[in-house]
A protein has these predicted regions:
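Conserved ATP-binding/catalytic core of the eukaryotic-like protein kinase fold
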Residues: 2-23, 28-182
């Protein structure tokens, strides 16, 4: 699946351009685990790739300086490194999200560039699944569970809105359900 980095519409792997706005569709991040590991070796140890999307890939890593704390490393696709608009969007995502302090919003630890210049965001690693995955796996969710999920999403969005931050990409893929009482 290829995702338009502007409007987030998804297309089959053989599509090259977004039908809505004509944006070229990037493939999954071309950053390999070994390349990423060598570029961040002093700071992080890459454990595994968690997933990929239109703007890049996310890896489970351990932050070496802090006792191998697990983190999710979001890495911008190399295909977008020469596009100032995407570099700015990636940076804005990190700085905006880092301003939000709320239990229903992932915590950003830092953002930066690997030794080869690949931008990354290190954030809280959450165990669980996206709402999209839960819906595909379980089908329709009970009304009470939906109400609780929506309540938590609304509280997180409210915290963002109080800071003047608008999400702009709220969808089941971007709602993460953690395990247990988290």
């Amino acid at each position: 699946v290829r995702t338009c980095p502007k409007c987030q519409r998804t297309y089959p792997d053989d599509a090259d351009f977004c039908l809505k706005d004509g944006t070229p569709l990037p493939s999954a991040s071309s950053v390999t685990e070994s390349e990423l590991a060598s570029g961040l070796a002093r700071r992080y140890r890459i454990v595994k790739k968690l997933g990929a999307g239109g703007m890049g890939a996310v890896f489970l890593a351990e932050q070496i300086a802090l006792g191998n704390r697990p983190v999710a490393l979001k890495v911008l696709s190399r295909r977008l490194l020469d596009d100032p608009e995407f570099l700015l969007r990636f940076h804005d995502e990190a700085t905006s999200t880092a301003r939000i302090r709320h239990t229903n919003v992932v915590t950003i630890y830092e953002s930066g560039q690997s030794d080869d210049g690949t931008p990354y965001i290190a954030m809280e690693y959450l165990e669980g699944e996206t709402l999209r995955h839960a819906l595909r796996r379980r089908g329709a969710l009970p009304v009470a569970e939906c109400a609780e999920i929506l309540s938590q999403v609304a509280r997180g969005l409210n915290a963002a809105h109080k800071l003047g931050i608008i999400h702009r990409d709220l969808k089941p893929d971007n709602i993460f359900l953690t395990r247990g009482d988290e």
